[in-house]
Curated annotation (Swiss-Prot):
UniProt record similarity statement: Belongs to the DXR family.
Cysteine disulfide partners in this protein: none
Catalytic reaction list: 2-C-methyl-D-erythritol 4-phosphate + NADP(+) = 1-deoxy-D-xylulose 5-phosphate + NADPH + H(+)
Its EC number(s): 1.1.1.267
Chain segments annotated as coiled-coil in the UniProt record: none
Record's protein name: 1-deoxy-D-xylulose 5-phosphate reductoisomerase
Amino acid sequence: MKKIALLGSTGSVGTSTLEVVGQHPEDFSVVAMAAGTNIDLLTLQVETFKPELVSVGNEKAAVELRDRLAGKSQPEIVYGAEGLELVARHEAANFVMTAVVGSVGVAPTLAAIEAGKTIGLANKETLVSAGPVVMKRAKEKGVSIIPVDSEHSAVYQCLQGERMEDVAKIILTASGGSFRHLSREDLEQVTVEQALAHPNWSMGAKITIDSATMMNKGFEVIEAHWLFDLPYEQIECVLHYESIIHSMVEYKDRAVMAQLGTPDMKVPIQYAMSYPIRKKLPTEPLDLVKIATLHFAAMDYERYPLLKLAYECGMAGGTHTAVLNAANEVAVDMFLKGAIRFLDIEKVVRKTCEAHSGVASPELADIFAADEWARSYALVSI
């Protein structure tokens, strides 16, 4: 049985992970979970899945959770950054699902690696910020990192049984996000509500905004570089409006392997959790006859300048991608709060990245320092 430590249980990926666990109680159990401050939902999750250890965002949330569970069988309750790491390395867990949002995922992912856990990685910011440190340590510890992002899961599946030296390139598909049919001029006036209406996927607020700016795809390019040890020149992005082909791998003989399916995050979540076995999943089957036509278009890097910037930062290496991620987190948060306009996200991120001198071969402390600097700079650059 897979005994799961779940980081980010109340988020989009976290709740979908628990749905998968609930559908296969004979195969999966949750022994530890971490959430932020959504105590209403977390209380229900704790009562349903009965973990041994629970971490919340702060001490106030910990007190509230204890009060909610008064008179019932209670798990050990911890909080904060230390609590996240305790969940990640919980002794009873043999699989850690990292589904928290943002660079907060770096430390618990490293804690899980040090503890020798198999990792289902749904937190792309971990590799964007700290890819060289995380992947080096995972290799040293012999830890498997199985991607949960639909695109990277697709590539991972297409690579099974193949040799990496036979890969010509990987092709990441992108829906184009909420505003794919709008001109740059139209983007000046878009609202938060419009930006949160993704055409194909149901996701959290930040990743939906990142999809609209195409920053999400930029992060996926950087993540793919680290996951599959490929140079950026071998990672291509293409627009695919239906989100049916999740990604592709082209080999040296020009054969192309693709993974298709209806847009449902439970598919890559369950694949990571049950790997290398596939289990039945009650989701809508793919009906190609009903779909009839799939559409593709070349990526427009002038239309999506943050994707272009992600390639630039990735190729620059070092701490540049940590700064890219931190500046984007600040800018998206400000947009969601109504403090800046949609296109200001791009301006804040580029201005911050251009001001960064960078550390070429960073240690973890250098990455955290770059992250902190970028957040401060981005705030005053608005």
